[in-house]
Regions:
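PLD-like (HKD) phosphodiesterase/transphosphatidyltransferase domain
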Residues: 1-59, 139-154
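Short glycine-/polar-rich loops that comprise or flank the Walker A/P-loop
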Residues: 35-37, 92-96, 119
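A generic structural signal for short, solvent-exposed coil/turn residues
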Residues: 4-6, 33, 90, 101, ...
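Generic secondary-structure microfeatures
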Residues: 16, 43-45, 83, 102, ...
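HKD-type phospholipase D/PLD-like phosphodiesterase module
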Residues: 52-107
Length: 167
């Protein structure tokens, strides 16, 4: 994912479930990219998980992660603080947004420059108890336009249904 993000020219969209890796590495990983492009983050809504324990329990079982709602809550808190710090910095050239969604997560996705001919995405599908071994696909708009457009349309549904937390 990071290598793809490094190729971005104008913007990066990152869709994840718990976003734990990104939350741990945000200050190193995203700070450099924010010098060149804007970044948009989408993750599960931690409040929704806390208030919908059955749903959270299903996701806990699906991902094989104990206390999944708490795990998402901690990642969200960390990412929110990072976004606020970055956006409040008067020297920050590009902004970062953070939005949450409640739809069942089926994949994580990183999309760079979706409105250009050089657009590209990496899609990682979640399967039951998959751990770190997940099917991963790199899709270039120039080579497989229909597939790229189809998957990006799927992502746009999520973008439109999400709730902006940091604008």
């Amino acid at each position: 994912f990071r290598l793809l993000r490094d190729r971005a020219q104008s913007e990066i969209y990152i869709i994840g479930a718990g976003m734990s890796k990104l939350a741990r590495l945000a200050s190193n990983s995203l700070e450099n990219q924010l010098r060149a492009v804007s970044v948009h983050l989408y993750m599960l809504d931690p409040d929704y998980l806390v208030n919908n324990k059955e749903y959270a329990k299903l996701l806990e079982d699906f991902f094989g992660i104990r206390d999944f709602a708490e795990y998402v809550k901690l990642s969200f808190k960390s990412l929110k603080a990072f976004c606020e710090d970055h956006n409040n910095n008067p020297k920050a050239k590009n902004r970062i947004t953070l939005s949450t969604y409640t739809a069942p997560p089926t994949m994580s996705m990183v999309v760079i420059d979706p409105q250009t001919k050089n657009a590209e995405m990496v899609v990682e599908y979640f399967t039951y108890h998959c751990g770190e071994e997940r099917p991963l696909f790199n899709i270039k708009k120039e080579k497989t336009t229909k597939m790229f457009d189809s998957l990006y349309t799927h992502a746009e549904y999520l973008f439109n249904a999400s709730k902006e937390v940091i604008i």
